[in-house]
Curated annotation (Swiss-Prot):
Residue span of region Disordered: 516-579, 811-851, 1077-1160, 1422-1443, 1801-1822, 1949-2032
UniProt effect for mutating residue 1939 to A: Abolishes localization to spindle microtubules, no effect on localization to centrosomes and kinetochores
Feature: compositional bias, Polar residues: 1971-1983
Stretch forming the signal peptide: none
Species name: Homo sapiens (Human)
Pfam families in alphabetical order: CLASP_N (PF12348), XMAP215_CLASP_TOG (PF21041)
Gene: CKAP5
Region (TOG 4): 853-1081
Protein name: Cytoskeleton-associated protein 5
SMART domains: TOG
Start and end residues of each stretch annotated as TOG 1: 1-223
């Protein structure tokens, strides 16, 4: 015990250090008493304890420590020297006190820290506390934060430095410990109390939920400025003063002092400056100067990323600014100008005043660039110049600005004035002195008198701002000469201006802070938005637009921005964008109630929280109705959603009410300006309900609506974080499911990949299987966008889970992400000036990978690691490499900065240890994947050394090196490798391995490039040396690479490069070059073109086994079976077979059976399409060779590996031919059961069979041909259409085999060629076979010529390609062949053609030698054949072929141009009549007398025959004149295949089969929609329009009356027609080709359609009529104005003449004319006025004034007067000079009317009234009335005499006689022949019978009276018009002509008919010029071939000026036809 008490004797300081706790406790107690007693703070007593205070606070005994803390507190409070202990004591407190469980200890520790701050040691304390935040013990961290918070609360932000605290805040918010996060939240609230919104930017990236919580807390804070409650010792007096003031109630002065103490914190000051200059890409300054805009863009984008840092470190930015300035000033690409301006803005904002030194250089360039008018460029420039202004002063840039003020460009002047106005707002009276103001005012005063209003307005605004800043007194001297109006305007502008100088410090800073932030941070807080508005409010210019510009900022590349939400908002209005991006301030519940009550019914608000669920439901219904009726601008979204959230809110128990609630949320989000603040009110509730069975769907809908309003990235982040903060697994799984679907709908752009990956990992670790499944599904969707790199993030997962993820990824393999359907509603790609959208079709994943977080690993590449890699000991080197591999593997994705690693790895590529070399290569592969495209900066220093390794002697090392080079090239592209001399230097090395590998690599890569650097030429000399290398493999590789070098460099350059070679070498190399020139592939097409086909509907219809080809409405309707079923069939059948086969397996063969049990061909979705795409893009070798080389075989093997069973592939590529036979036998067996597989792999099967053609074994060849026969039979049954790719890689090799010496093989090949025509157009087969005639093998030539003859015999002349003329000339050449068999074959082929087409063949074959010609003539004589019928084989023997063509709708565009006319007729005859073609020909051979006299039994076919005959004769003549005869060989000789294809398709437009017509229209629409192809339609416009209105008439008369026909089909057809017409009339050059007659008939058809009441009754009828309206407007505006005006006048004339025409029709025609009149002022100069006046003259002649006045409506006369008045007004007296085309001006009143109008307009005094004029006119009328009657009758008789107008003339004569019964027409008949007189009398009798209802003729012809009434007669086209169904009589000459046409079409001779005059000779020449009917122009191109005939017609027409010939023929014709009709009538009645 004695020992224990010894310490009692010790002094206090020793007790305090004693090892016994009791001694220490006693010592501390004594010390405390001592400290309390010492009154003098400078007493020496204090110093004794100076070294002990740390021990006081760090005592190990908790009880003792408490006492020590008390003593330490007193010491610090009173001792003068206490400050010296700050560091160690506070450190002790942090580490040993803050971790104590006792609250008292912690409180004392905090008090000690605060006391140190009070004694002015705040910095040291803060430093130690911040160190404490890094401690691992959360208790310590919490206590440190609490201490800092208390210190800030008590001492204020002036004493406690906020910047270091704010810097660590985000890290604290990420802590796992809730206590730490809670304490961080409290300190953030405290900091916000002191600095307000300056805290927002640093916290933008914390978790959104935490940010939301902070926002809620911040809103609760009082708005009054905070005050410190505790003061430093030096401020104790101030504290005393403050207490005194508080006791006295305070005064203003105290408040003022206090206010001064609260510092104004600038957020900029709180940010860390970032150094960006060193981070610029090394090649930046080269790229910014590059010729390619894409490279310049890449350089600018790299700067754009760097300048997003809000605060930049000072440095030398001169070069960077200079480069950006150059882009702004000189770049022609506006997109890059805007991007460079954006970069300058970022630099100015980030550097602030440090940028001022560069301002003077940049400002003039920007001001000059304002000449650019594109809004996005102007906006970017405005933002840039505004940001730059804030870095300098107006004085500094005044000279530059004033210099631009005199620019002539008004846009520059306007924008400069606006900039001055904005600059003035930042000035004060002191910063805008008179010396500065004077020059600006002088310049602006010039602008207020500018001619451009926008310049004047901008100048007024600038002067008004100056007035507001410096006051009237300072400005008035400069405004002395300004007039009052302008002065008032300046003052008005001045009143509107809001200045910034009053709050300059704060707001300018805020402006700088927040302007860039929306682009740099994902979300912005409420106050930040408020500030942005405050700044931008007074500025109409760029500051207001800043948020809009930035909103679409983050996604940089064109393609990915499109699917996402962010990039697509560009076209929406700016305001809408701001509301989306800006979070509105949170409203209090009172404000919300007030706003809601203003828009909702009162009962609704009251019943929201009713206890009765029915009342709540009724309330919700009212709520919904109110929301539906609200306008977007009036809807208070936040107030409404807060009302919904009001009790019971989301805890609503009734599911019906809850469903309504959720639906209303969705409605509000869709209809209102929904902000993120509103979203935050409801999202928690939605997430809570998403898992609900009844309400889940509604919750998802609401979320989707919110995502559309607030953008998906933000919404998704909120929703997922909320879901995972809950513990409900159902909610979590459903949230992930919703997100999967949302990504597909919105696209992936802007999504925070990192955040989702962490959430998905959480979900994958969940115990609930539904959550895991949902997470895996989400990963699958993300995989679509991110690609294989996504898997890297989940490699650490459990194997079972990883296999599930892999399975999901496998499902998505090959699929492309769907196009976004949401978030792009009003999007138009206006921002992509260079068409960027198409530039990157499939590389969206690369852009998404850019979003993935990349790790900085440079700090891990330490010098130790580098020295390890370079160590002498290989084991240590290996360790170093292992470490590097581990670093890269852990990081997954890395940043390009990798320190000294490239140098270290480069050394290892030359390592003597080959294992290490391989390991290094593996690391380099890893590096390429991890670094991505950024690896390109390491190509020169690390990539080229990899190529050196290709020269290694070991195979495996070379293979690894090649794989590495490919991995790098995949990331970098080839440009970096080919630039410079590095590659040529490698090739120069005489290492055979290196040369082989390098040349092989280049041969693989060069074909895929569109362009290469010029440095490629440097490789050529070394390539030539490789061609002569000793090593054979090197030579072979060099030869293979030669065409690809030539592809890029061209033959000339390559040949020129041989100049330096030795003469012997040169000759050899040149020979090789010639050979390579033949095999040189074309350069790959640009991606835009490549992608345009799949994007549009124009891609060929490829067979898709997995899904029915429903893209085309026609082809899908003809598909007999849906493809999915087919796809399943083989699987089932093969399983069934295998089950049977496996009943009794022997053990030895079990494995083999299992291997062979499955299908032999595997259906790979889109596999064939991908292979075609690869071949087209030259990614693989094109299947084109003379003999198959190894690389082709290897390529085919590789392609087959994915879709052919392995065991079969082994057989197919076995070296033994017996295995080939075995493979073919298996393929034959599986042919029927695996149709889909065969079709899916058809291209590969055919290629493999071509290889078999080169085998010498006959049995294999026979087996292959047997298989081919079966294969093509199957394909034709399946109606499959061979693709171009399949055909071109197979047919040439098959054609070679036709020359085999064995007859049996030749016979089989011919049979196969014959069957191929069932699956591939004969016209496309023709060129392949024609190519075969050029062979050296005479047997092949002979067989090919025979096959050509068969094709012509079967399919007609149009099968000949490119034209019959060229084809026959080539065939005729072989008549002179040395081989007899070839000569005979050529002669037989031409004889075949002769048998089909007669003597025309001699014109086509051209000049033959006398010998050849005599041989041909002799052969023709010997054949003893008259020309027979055209090929009927295609109808009779090839029905399958016809179906195949029609069913493959998409192929018609490319499809066969052969045999067009015959196919068209065949289609018509098959659809319209069941009879065969021969029966149609017998129609004109009927013996009518025999039929008439035959009263016995009728032959079974007679009724059909007669009925057919009647229909065909008396229905309107479908094919007028001889103009649609079969397309003759002459036509093909003159026109290309394209023209004939278009003719064929146009002919199908008028088809009676709706599907055929729709197909044709679809194809034409494709052509019209592509600008580069639309020109192909030129010259076919009339033909196309005729076919179109023929179809319109057909629909009107036939289809609409057909009850069996689906009306939807008719609507579809109408839609196609109208869509086509609109496309056509949007192309002005094509629209102007339409002629008058065609336009007239087209307008007739369209107006008839608009008036069709049957259409209005259909469901979509109104839409059709609206579309027609639109089309009519297009026709009127875009057609040739003369033609359309003329057409309308003629149409009006016809409609007024026609008795059956409705008034409504005429009215619509007149409306069209009125529209044309309105257009006249703009179009008068382009109109042929002479022609129009001639048409008006004819109109006025037919309708004199009296007759017009008799019309029921006054509109016709008003229309005519208006038209003439407008013409007079526009042309003046010159109009009278345009009557040149009128022969007899007295025939109408036109000239008199024009004279009156001119006289009236020129009479200035107005003395002559209109009445006098009219009286004068009436006197003239009276004098001429008698003459008029005679003229009128003469006109009628001329019409009767004219064949065209005979019917109309008779009708008019009948009307005239009926009206004027006493009229004498004898004088007119007296001079005519007896025939003519009897014809007129009989015609009048017939009309009388018709009018009185005795419709004998009508009924006998089978034409319904209804059709008579509905059809409007068109007098100018009675014979030829399709719609002519009103029972007109038609002369037999018409039938004779039709017979002639039909005979010619069928290939019959017409020579016997030559004595009959042609149809046109039977027509009299019309007395007045009439508009040629549209159908007269059909096939107008044939006119050149009928020149001789036309001359004959002209002579006939001239001779027919008198009536005699016409009338005789006419009357005899009528007599004959009447007789014919009567006889037919008797036949019919006798059969009844």
């Amino acid at each position: 015990m004695g020992d224990d008490s010894e310490w009692l004797k010790l002094p206090v300081d020793q007790k305090c250090e004693h090892k016994l706790w009791k001694a220490r406790l006693s010592g501390y107690e004594e010390a405390l008493k001592i400290f309390q007693k010492i009154k003098d703070e400078k007493s020496p007593e204090w110093s004794k304890f100076l070294g002990l205070i740390k021990k006081f606070v760090t005592d190990s005994n908790a009880v003792v420590q408490l006492k020590g803390l008390e003593a330490a507190l007193v010491y610090v409070e009173n001792a003068h020297v206490a400050g010296k202990t700050t560091g160690e004591v506070v450190s002790g407190v942090v580490s040993k006190v803050f971790n104590q469980p006792k609250a008292k200890a912690k409180e004392l520790g905090i008090e000690i820290c605060l006391m140190y701050i009070e004694i002015e040691k705040g910095e040291a304390v803060q430093e130690e506390l911040l160190k404490g935040l890094d401690n691992k013990n959360p208790k310590i961290i919490v206590a440190c934060i609490e201490t800092l918070r208390k210190a800030l609360s008590e001492f204020g932000s002036k004493i406690i430095l906020l910047k270091p605290i704010i810097k660590v805040l985000p890290k604290l918010f990420e802590s796992r410990e809730k206590a730490v996060r809670d304490e961080a939240k409290l300190i953030a609230v405290e900091i916000y109390r002191w600095i307000r919104d300056a805290l927002r930017p640093p916290l933008q990236n914390i978790n959104s939920v935490q940010l939301k919580e902070l926002e809620e807390e911040w809103v609760k804070l009082p708005t009054s400025a905070p005050r410190p409650t505790r003061f430093l010792r030096s401020q104790q007096e101030l504290e005393a003063k403050l207490e005194q003031q508080q006791s006295a109630g305070g005064d203003a002065e105290g408040g003022g002092d206090d206010g001064d103490e609260v510092p104004q914190i600038d957020a900029y000051e709180l940010l860390e400056a970032v150094e960006i200059l060193s981070k610029l890409p090394k090649d930046f300054y080269d790229k910014i100067e590059a010729k390619k805009w894409q490279e310049r863009k890449e350089a600018l984008e790299s700067v754009e990323v760097l300048i997003k840092n809000p605060k930049l470190e000072a440095g030398d930015y001169a070069d960077l600014v200079k480069a950006l300035k150059k882009v702004v000033g000189k770049d022609t690409n506006v997109m890059l100008v805007a991007l460079a301006a954006k970069c300058l803005t970022g630099l100015a904002v980030g550097l602030r005043k440090k940028f001022g030194q560069y301002a003077g250089h940049v400002v003039p360039t920007i001001l000059e660039k304002f000449k650019e008018k594109k809004p996005q460029v102007v906006q970017a420039l405005q933002e840039a110049i505004d940001a730059i202004f804030l870095t300098t002063t107006l004085q500094n840039i005044s000279e530059d600005v004033l210099a631009v003020m005199d620019n002539k460009n008004p846009t520059i002047k306007q924008q400069t004035s606006l900039f001055i106005a904005r600059s003035f707002r930042h000035c004060t009276a002191s910063t805008l002195p008179k010396s500065l103001l004077k020059p600006f005012c002088a310049a602006l005063l010039k602008h207020i008198n500018d001619s451009a209003p926008e310049v004047r307005d901008a100048a007024f605004e600038a002067l008004g701002t100056a007035l507001k800043v410096v006051g009237e007194k300072a400005v008035n001297p400069f405004l002395a000469d300004v007039d009052k109006l302008k002065l008032d305007k300046i003052k008005e502008c001045s009143e509107k201006v809001e200045l910034i100088h009053g709050k300059k410090a704060g707001l300018a800073a805020d402006k700088k802070e927040f302007k860039p932030l929306p682009g740099r941070t994902a979300a912005s807080g409420a106050a930040g938005d408020k500030d942005t508005k405050d700044i931008s409010a007074p500025k109409p210019g760029p500051l207001k637009k800043a948020p809009a510009a930035k909103a679409g900022g983050p996604p940089k590349k064109g393609k990915p921005a499109a699917p996402g939400g962010a990039g697509n908002t560009g076209t929406k209005n700016k305001k809408g964008l701001e509301t989306k991006e800006i979070v509105e301030p949170e409203l209090s519940i009172e404000v919300c109630e007030e706003k809601a009550s203003a828009v909702l019914p009162p009962t609704c608000i009251q019943l929201l929280d009713s206890s009765n669920w029915k009342e709540r439901l009724a309330c919700m219904e009212e709520f919904q109705k109110a929301v539906e009726l609200m306008d977007r601008t009036e809807m208070p979204c936040q107030a409404l959603v807060r009302m919904l959230a009001k009790k019971p809110g989301w805890k609503e128990t009734n599911f019906q009410v809850m469903q309504m609630k959720l639906h209303i949320v969705a409605l509000i989000a869709q209809k209102g300006n929904f902000s993120k603040t509103s979203a935050q009110v409801v999202l928690d509730g939605l997430v809570d309900k998403i898992g609900d069975v009844k309400c889940g769907n509604n919750a998802k809908e609401a979320m989707t609506a919110i995502a559309e309003a607030c953008m998906l990235p933000w919404t998704a982040e909120q929703v997922v974080s909320m879901a995972f903060s809950q513990k409900n697994p159902k909610n979590q799984s459903e949230t992930l499911n919703w997100l999967s679907n949302a990504i597909k709908e919105f696209g992936f752009s802007g999504l925070n990949v990192k955040a989702f990956i962490s959430n998905v990992k959480t979900a994958l670790a969940a115990t609930n299987p539904a959550v895991r499944t949902a997470a895996i599904t989400l990963l699958g969707v993300m995989y679509l966008y991110v690609g294989p790199s996504l898997r890297m993030f989940f490699e650490d997962e459990k194997p079972a889970l990883l296999s599930q993820i892999d399975a999901e990824f496998e499902k998505m393999q090959g699929q492309s992400p769907p196009a976004p359907t949401r978030g792009i509603s009003k999007h138009s790609t206006s921002g992509t000036d260079e068409g960027e959208d198409g530039d990157e079709p499939d590389d969206g994943s690369n852009d998404v990978v850019d979003l993935l977080p990349r790790t900085e690993i440079s700090d891990k590449i330490t010098s130790e690691l580098v020295s390890k890699i370079g160590d002498k000991n290989w084991k240590i080197r290996k360790e170093g490499l292992d470490e590097v591999a581990g670093i890269i593997n852990d990081a997954k994705f890395i940043q390009p900065n990798i320190g000294e690693l490239p140098t270290a790895l480069k050394g290892r590529l030359n390592d003597s240890n080959k294992i290490l070399v391989q390991q290094t290569l593996n690391i380099l592969q890893q590096l390429a994947v991890a670094m991505g495209p950024n690896i390109k900066q390491h190509v020169k220093n690390l990539g080229i050394p990899i190529i050196t390794v290709l020269g290694d002697s070991k195979n495996n090392v070379r293979a690894a090196a090649l794989a590495t080079v490919n991995a790098w090239a995949e990331q970098t592209g080839m440009k970096e490798w080919l630039e410079g001399e590095d590659l040529s230097e490698e090739l120069k090395k005489e290492n055979p391995f290196l040369r082989q590998e390098l040349l092989g690599w280049l041969a693989e890569k060069l074909p895929t490039l569109r362009s290469t650097p010029t440095d490629l030429i440097l490789c050529v000399p070394h390539l030539y040396s490789c061609l002569e290398d000793r090593n054979g493999d090197v030579r072979k590789k060099a030869q293979d690479a030669l065409p690809f070098f030539m592809m890029h460099l061209g033959y000339e350059k390559m040949a020129k490069a041989t100049g330096k070679l030795k003469p012997t070498s040169k000759d050899q190399v040149l020979a090789m070059l010639e050979k390579a020139k033949v095999n040189m592939p074309a350069k790959p097409a640009p991606p835009t073109k490549a992608t345009s086909k799949p994007m549009g509907g124009s891609a060929p219809a490829k067979f898709q086994p997995a899904s029915a080809p429903a893209e085309d409405c026609i082809s899908s309707s003809t598909e007999p079976k849906p493809d999915p079923k087919k796809a399943k069939a083989p699987g089932l059948s093969s399983k069934a077979k295998s089950a049977q086969g496996k009943k009794m397996p022997s053990k030895t063969s079990l494995k083999e059976d299992e291997d062979k049990s499955g299908p032999i061909f595997i259906v790979v979705p889109n596999g064939k399409e991908q292979r075609m795409k690869d071949e087209k893009g030259l990614k693989v070798l094109k299947w084109n060779f003379t003999t198959p080389r190894d690389e082709y075989i290897e390529q085919l093997k590789t392609q087959m590996s994915s879709c052919v069973a392995k065991w079969l592939q082994d057989e197919m590529f076995h070296s033994d031919f017996q295995h080939h036979n075995k493979a073919l036998a298996v393929m034959v067996d599986h042919l029927e059961s695996e149709k889909e597989g065969v079709i899916g792999c058809l291209d590969l099967i055919l290629k493999w069979l071509t290889l078999r053609f080169f085998d010498t074994n006959t049995s294999v060849l026979m087996k292959a041909l047997e298989y081919l026969k079966l294969l093509f039979t199957l394909l034709s049954e399946e109606e499959y259409h061979l693709t171009e790719n399949e055909a071109s890689s197979f047919i040439p090799y098959l054609v070679v085999k036709v020359g085999e010496p064995k007859d049996v093989i030749r016979k089989d090949v011919r049979a196969i060629l014959n069957r191929m025509c069932l699956v591939y157009p004969a016209s496309k087969m023709f060129p392949f076979i024609m190519e075969g005639t050029k062979s050296k093998n005479s047997k092949q030539r002979a067989e090919c010529l025979e096959e050509l003859g068969c094709l012509v015999e079967s399919y007609g002349m149009n099968v000949c390609q490119p034209t019959p003329g060229k084809a026959l000339k080539e065939i005729a050449v072989h008549i002179g062949d040395r081989d007899n068999a070839v000569r005979n074959a050529a002669l037989n082929t031409i004889v075949t053609v002769y048998n089909v087409h007669g003597d025309q063949v001699f014109k086509l074959i051209g000049n033959l030698s006398e010998k050849d010609m005599s041989m041909l003539e002799e052969r023709i004589k010997r054949s003893a054949k008259r020309p027979s019928a055209a090929p009927i084989k295609q109808v009779e023997e090839k029905p399958q072929r016809a179906q195949n063509i029609s069913s493959n709708a998409n192929m018609l565009r490319k499809g066969p141009a052969e045999d067009m006319s015959s196919k068209l007729n065949q289609a018509r005859s098959m659809s319209g009549h069941p009879e065969a073609a021969q029966m149609v020909r017998r129609e004109f051979q009927l013996d009518l007398d025999e039929i008439e006299n035959d009263n016995g039994t009728v032959r079974c076919e007679m009724p059909e025959l007669v009925q057919h005959k009647l229909d065909d004769i008396f229905e309107p003549v479908l094919i007028p004149e001889p103009k649609i005869r079969a397309v003759s060989p002459h036509f093909d000789d003159m026109h290309s295949n394209t023209a004939s294809t278009i003719n064929f398709i146009i002919s199908q437009v008028a088809s009676g089969d709706i599907n055929t017509s729709i197909q044709a229209l679809t194809q034409i629409d494709e052509v019209l929609r592509q600008e580069d192809k639309a020109e192909a339609m030129s010259g076919h416009i009339d033909q196309f329009l005729i076919a179109t209105f023929m179809q319109l008439r057909l629909i009107y008369n036939t289809h609409m009356a057909d009850e069996k026909l689906e009306k939807d089909e008719i609507i579809k057809l109408y839609s196609c027609i109208i869509g086509n017409m609109i496309s056509l009339f949007q192309i002005e050059s094509l629209a102007r080709e339409a002629s008058t007659g065609v336009l007239k008939d087209l307008m007739h058809g369209l107006i008839t359609l608009m008036l069709d009441s049957r259409i209005e009754d259909l469901e979509e009828g109104q839409q059709v009529i609206r579309s027609v309206n639109l089309l009519v407007v297009k026709v009127l505006e875009k057609s040739d104005q003369t033609n359309i005006l003329s057409a309308l006048l003629v149409l009006l004339q016809d409609s007024l003449l026609a008795t059956a025409s409705s008034p409504k029709f005429s009215e619509l025609v007149m409306k069209c004319l009125w529209r044309m009149v309105r257009l006249l002022p703009d179009t008068i100069n382009s109109i042929n006025l002479d022609r129009i006046l001639l048409d008006i003259h004819i109109f006025m002649k037919v309708f004199p004034k009296e007759k017009l006045k008799q019309c029921k409506s006054e509109f016709p006369i008003r229309t005519l007067k208006t038209l003439l008045h407008t013409l007079c007004k526009l042309k003046g007296p010159k109009i009278l000079d345009h009557l040149t085309m009128i022969d007899n001006k007295n025939e109408s009143e036109l000239e008199a009317h024009l004279c009156r109008m001119m006289k009236h307009s020129m009479d200035q005094t107005g003395s002559k009234s209109d009445k006098e004029t009219e009286k004068g006119a009436s006197r003239i009328d009276e004098k001429s009335s008698k003459a008029k009657v005679n003229d009128f009758l003469a006109e009628i008789f001329k019409k009767i005499g004219s064949k065209e107008n005979t019917k109309e003339g008779l009708a008019e004569l009948y009307e005239y006689k009926k009206k004027y019964s006493d009229a004498d027409i004898e004088p007119f008949l007296k001079n005519s022949s007896q025939f003519f007189q009897s014809y007129v009398e009989r015609g009048l009798r017939v009309i009388e019978m018709e009018r009185e209802g005795k419709g004998r003729i009508s009924t006998s012809t089978g034409i319904s009276p209804q059709m008579e009434v509905t059809c409007v007669p068109t007098p100018t086209s009675t014979v030829s018009s399709i719609g002519n169904t009103n029972g007109e009589e038609v002369g037999p000459s018409v039938y004779l002509e039709r017979l002639k046409i039909l005979r010619q079409r069928c290939g019959l001779d017409n020579t016997k008919q030559d004595d009959r005059p042609p149809l046109t000779s039977l027509l009299s020449k019309p007395a007045v010029p009439t508009v040629a009917s549209s159908t007269d122009m059909l096939h107008s191109k044939l006119s050149q071939l009928r020149e001789s005939r036309e001359q004959h017609q002209h002579s006939d027409l001239d001779s027919n000026q008198t009536h005699s010939s016409g009338t005789v023929t006419s009357s005899s014709s009528t007599a004959n036809i009447d007789d014919l009709k009567k006889r037919l009538e008797r036949i019919k009645s006798s059969r009844k």
